[in-house]
Amino acid sequence: MQIYLANPRGFCAGVDRAIAIVNEALLRFEPPIYVRHEVVHNKFVVSDLANRGAVFVEELHEVPDGSIVIFSAHGVSKAVEDEAERRDLTVFDATCPLVTKVHIEVAKFAQDGMDAVLIGHAGHPEVEGTMGRFNHRHGGQIHLVENESDVEALSVQDAERLAFVTQTTLSMDDTARVIDALREKFPSIQGPRKDDICYATQNRQDAVKDLAGRCEVVLVVGSPNSSNSNRLRELAERMNCRAYLIDNATEMNKSWFDGIQSVGVTAGASAPEVLIQEVLQQLQNWGGDLPSELLGIEENVTFSLPKALRIPMTQVGK
């Protein structure tokens, strides 16, 4: 059985930064270090950080006044930010800079009194944070749509003063269809200068298309609550390739590969390489060949840590 390995795969720059922020905070400060929501959507990563002292909570009221809290990579609403300031919390913001870019876009549309349309998945923390960045005091409204049917039912205040943004981890193909529907219904709608779907999401979706074109089965390493990982599985399935989303190698079933000559492996942007290697090892234990890594776009994006976490340890407290 041939094994193909997608490239790029796994951690993106935003995830690297978010995990590094928690790690640095754990090194520099006395516990407890609170993290609002899973810092990234991966069970292995969250469990590892929790074992080293991070305390994960869902809401800010679970964090005692005056404590250290880290906001997850998905971002938070302005109300959460304001509450943290009111309660004298020391905040390290692990929001991905590409999510922050969308927050800035939304805030500008609100400031201009426009309506905004957010393309995204209801209930996802990134969507909740972005919706919460829209200030209604200037007369505008923000609307959430997930698909073309939502666009068909959408009613806005002024179709001539309307803009859209998107969640960063969506399917590129699905989003393109929703944007087309918006432009058809609202010809004057404004959009971002550069696509809001992040570079890592785009690159991993392109890579899984390549993978699915070669393989009978595709394994996506990622947690069930990871938006970008789910989109990878769905994309492989749309290319008529059987696909499974797995947290780790223990979730694999040997029967999936009965009579299979080729299998592909990729990973969502919040899945660490160690989990990918465990999957590859299990496939080889079941008779797979040495993995062949496919060519792909080389990623060299990096994001800086907050200034307070870049100060050399020898200067902390001076």
Curated annotation (Swiss-Prot):
Active site: E126 (proton donor)
InterPro entries: LytB/IspH
HAMAP family (UniProt xref): IspH
Enzyme class: oxidoreductase
Protein name from the UniProt record: 4-hydroxy-3-methylbut-2-enyl diphosphate reductase
Sites where the protein binds dimethylallyl diphosphate: H41, H74, H124, S226, S227, N228, S270
Protein's UniProt keywords contain Transcription regulation: no
Enzyme Commission code(s) on record: 1.17.7.4
Chain residues that bind [4Fe-4S] cluster: C12, C96, C198
Catalytic activity: isopentenyl diphosphate + 2 oxidized [2Fe-2S]-[ferredoxin] + H2O = (2E)-4-hydroxy-3-methylbut-2-enyl diphosphate + 2 reduced [2Fe-2S]-[ferredoxin] + 2 H(+); dimethylallyl diphosphate + 2 oxidized [2Fe-2S]-[ferredoxin] + H2O = (2E)-4-hydroxy-3-methylbut-2-enyl diphosphate + 2 reduced [2Fe-2S]-[ferredoxin] + 2 H(+)
Cofactor: binding comment: Binds 1 [4Fe-4S] cluster per subunit.
This protein's record includes keyword Cell inner membrane: no
Gene Ontology BP terms: dimethylallyl diphosphate biosynthetic process; isopentenyl diphosphate biosynthetic process, methylerythritol 4-phosphate pathway; terpenoid biosynthetic process
Provenance organism: Psychrobacter cryohalolentis (strain ATCC BAA-1226 / DSM 17306 / VKM B-2378 / K5)
Family membership: Belongs to the IspH family.
Cofactors, names only: [4Fe-4S] cluster
Residues annotated to bind isopentenyl diphosphate: H41, H74, H124, S226, S227, N228, S270
Keywords: 4Fe-4S, Iron, Iron-sulfur, Isoprene biosynthesis, Metal-binding, Oxidoreductase
Superkingdom of the organism of origin: Bacteria
Molecular-function annotations in GO: 4 iron, 4 sulfur cluster binding; 4-hydroxy-3-methylbut-2-enyl diphosphate reductase activity; metal ion binding
Sequence intervals crossing the membrane: none
Protein role: Catalyzes the conversion of 1-hydroxy-2-methyl-2-(E)-butenyl 4-diphosphate (HMBPP) into a mixture of isopentenyl diphosphate (IPP) and dimethylallyl diphosphate (DMAPP). Acts in the terminal step of the DOXP/MEP pathway for isoprenoid precursor biosynthesis.
Positions contributing to (2E)-4-hydroxy-3-methylbut-2-enyl diphosphate binding: H41, H74, H124, T168, S226, S227, N228, S270
Pathway annotation from the record: Isoprenoid biosynthesis; dimethylallyl diphosphate biosynthesis; dimethylallyl diphosphate from (2E)-4-hydroxy-3-methylbutenyl diphosphate: step 1/1; Isoprenoid biosynthesis; isopentenyl diphosphate biosynthesis via DXP pathway; isopentenyl diphosphate from 1-deoxy-D-xylulose 5-phosphate: step 6/6
